[in-house]
């Protein structure tokens, strides 16, 4: 994982699985290769194996359970996603929150398996304590802006700048900004404010031309990073 980080959460949209899931993933990977920017896709558990077999970009799970092998019906263990080909997992998304002790256990297990973790935080106050668990990145997402089309980088830029100040207290953990990211301008602003990348879902998954959206994101991310040099 290295900046600019672009993480696309497929959630459970109609085009997140099956042949539609394969189709959108291939489009995303093509743009990723065209610009030399690895894009992380966080996909439904049922798609991890299929997509990891045909793609070179990192495939993540959307969630894992902090449980050991045993009688846990319906559980998704870190070992399971590794076996399926995942390179990492999202954790603690606003739509799939878990307790702090569960986050700690999951991050540790994921790291021990040689995988990556991105832990979501719904406020900048949580960035530092979550970063102390040493995931690869923290994804800051004010829940009220998720899926709203109103970008955190425009609506609440102070959330990003404060999160940046918190992440600097812990070495080796990236900060990703998400919630409402819709345009390349939103991406540029987020990185200008100090984020290492962006997280996005509906802007890509609901688009009729997802490859154009992703290309716009990459162009502006690279432009923002170049401007900061």
UniProtKB/Swiss-Prot annotation:
EC category: isomerase
Residue positions of the active site: 93 (electrophile), 141 (proton acceptor)
GO molecular function: triose-phosphate isomerase activity
Pathway: Carbohydrate biosynthesis; gluconeogenesis; Carbohydrate degradation; glycolysis; D-glyceraldehyde 3-phosphate from glycerone phosphate: step 1/1
Main location: cytoplasm
Matching InterPro entries: Aldolase_TIM, TIM_sf, Triosephosphate_isomerase, Triosephosphate_isomerase_arc
UniProt KW Cytoplasm keyword: yes
Subcellular location: Cytoplasm
Reactions mediated catalytically: D-glyceraldehyde 3-phosphate = dihydroxyacetone phosphate
Keywords: Cytoplasm, Gluconeogenesis, Glycolysis, Isomerase
Enzyme Commission number: 5.3.1.1
Annotated family: Belongs to the triosephosphate isomerase family.
Biological function: Involved in the gluconeogenesis. Catalyzes stereospecifically the conversion of dihydroxyacetone phosphate (DHAP) to D-glyceraldehyde-3-phosphate (G3P).
Protein name, per record: Triosephosphate isomerase
Phylogenetic placement of the source organism: Archaea, Thermoproteota, Thermoprotei, Sulfolobales, Sulfolobaceae
């Amino acid at each position: 994982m290295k900046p600019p980080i672009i993480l696309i959460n497929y959630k459970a949209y109609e085009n997140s699985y099956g042949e539609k899931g394969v189709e959108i993933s291939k489009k995303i990977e093509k743009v990723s290769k065209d610009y030399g920017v690895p894009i992380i896709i966080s996909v439904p558990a049922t798609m991890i194996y299929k997509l990891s077999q045909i793609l070179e970009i990192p495939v993540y799970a959307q969630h894992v359970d902090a449980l050991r092998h045993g009688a846990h019906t319906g559980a998704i263990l870190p070992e399971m996603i590794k076996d399926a080909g995942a390179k990492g997992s999202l954790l603690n998304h606003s739509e799939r929150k878990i307790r702090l002790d569960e986050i700690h256990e999951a991050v540790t297990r994921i790291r021990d398996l040689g995988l990556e973790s991105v832990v979501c935080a719904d406020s900048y106050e949580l960035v530092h304590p979550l970063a102390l668990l040493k995931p690869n990145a923290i994804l800051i997402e004010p829940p009220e802006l998720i899926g709203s089309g109103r970008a955190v980088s425009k609506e609440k830029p102070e959330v990003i700048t404060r999160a940046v100040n918190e992440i600097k207290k812990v070495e080796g953990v990236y900060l990703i900004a998400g919630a409402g990211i819709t345009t390349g301008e939103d991406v540029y602003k987020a990185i200008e404010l100090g984020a290492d990348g962006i997280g996005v879902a509906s802007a890509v998954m609901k688009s009729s031309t997802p490859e154009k959206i992703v290309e716009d994101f990459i162009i502006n991310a690279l432009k923002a990073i170049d401007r900061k040099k």
